[in-house]
A protein has these predicted regions:
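PRPP-associated nucleotide enzymes
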Residues: 1-169
């Protein structure tokens, strides 16, 4: 066991950057692999989620470039395959790598030797005793309340007089 990366703490969540070019630029400066730790080793990389796959692919490439013999990728959530309307700025399924790709296809796209996700059953089992509500909409497509008909960026681009949001206020 060892620390395989140095992380630039001043770079935030890369998947919420406005454009693909911004996401890739942020990923390049976010992490640096430590060759002396990973060279010649079988590495298990654990992450909270794969959203678009940009960070995942870059991170795995960094490990390989630093000499990792194998990279096995484990995700502590189910595949993020549906838009999140309640906190993550991902309004469209086309932006999500898990939409339209199998786990094996995602593994190939990100360049891992193996890929495993936590199942939705295990996630809900972990959260069952929580006093807070738990939304699985981005994993299952089943939301606790009706999903909005228009994305928030579209709502906020309109004058308030034209937005349906005004009716709810």
């Amino acid at each position: 066991y060892g620390v395989g990366f140095i992380k630039n703490k001043y770079v935030g969540r890369t998947f919420i950057q406005g454009s693909q070019a911004q996401r890739e630029s942020s990923v390049r400066i976010k992490l640096n692999a430590i060759s002396s730790t990973v060279a010649g080793k079988r590495v298990v990389l654990v992450d909270d989620s794969i959203v678009r796959g940009t960070t995942s692919a870059r991170t795995i490439k960094l490990l390989r470039d630093a000499g990792a013999k194998e990279v096995h990728y484990r995700i502590s959530a189910p595949p993020f395959a549906h838009p999140c309307y309640f906190g993550t700025d991902i309004p469209d399924e086309k932006d999500l790598i898990a939409t339209g790709h199998t786990v094996e296809e995602i593994r190939q796209i990100v360049g891992a030797d193996s890929l495993g996700y936590l199942s939705i059953e295990h996630v809900t089992q972990l959260a069952i005793h929580s006093k807070c509500g738990f939304c699985t909409g981005c994993f299952t497509g089943h939301y606790p309340v009706p999903a909005p008909n228009e994305t928030m960026d579209i709502v906020y681009d309109k004058p308030l007089s034209q937005s349906q949001t005004k009716k709810r206020l």
